[in-house]
Amino acid sequence: MTRIYTLANQKGGVGKTTTAINLSAYMANFGQKVLLIDLDPQANATSSLGVDKQTVNKGTYEVLIGSASIANHVLHNPKLKISLLPSSPSLAGAEVELIALENRETLLWNAIQQVQDRYDYILIDCPPSLSILTVNGLVAARDGVIIPVQCEYLALEGLGELTKTLSRVKNSLFPGLKTRGILLTMFDGRTRLGQDVVQDVKSHFPKLVFNTIIPRSIYLAEAPSRGIPISVHAPESHAGLSYAALAREILDQDGIAISEI
């Protein structure tokens, strides 16, 4: 059974792409066949896995507009054991082009169905905005949306806006849309603010917050510049252990036995 999770937040800088990359890496480490789809025109997930976004021949953009098959343009990294549908700057133009297409909100989901039986998990990294690209990511989230939330001021306000968006998409496009979980990121236990945000989010969404909390870490900032996930760059760091714990938590909730490879 393939599980499809979309990582989304309309607010940028919350650790969304960082989570997409590192959750994919640890799930692969734990024996899962993982496809990461970069749906963001900034292509940060693509470059963070060592792929030059300027040299991407065909990727998410071409798949969405129908000029390429998703099956033929997935890149596999044998070292990391992750498959990637890369993005490129050309995806920025899709916003205009997709408006004219029929069933434009379901283009990604239609493409994913061609390959979903090849993977245990498909993770989709959305852009930090409410756009037709993000809507495609939400409609494709057959098993839920993972929402990273930065442990900083106004976190709840941004989360409230996103839940309204999810509700609108659920009511108009995909009745099965649900929140898989809220992930608290960039936590600094030395500050009162960080601790207060954790308590506030947990009190407002008691059944949705993951037990794992991702700390603020220089290692998470360094790894993308080297084109590798934290599981390779600094697996024994607090951040590395935290993302490993998140992968274990999700796999356990999904009833998946873990086998490290």
Question: Where in this protein do the model-derived segments appear?
Answer:
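P-loop NTP-binding core
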Residues: 1-261
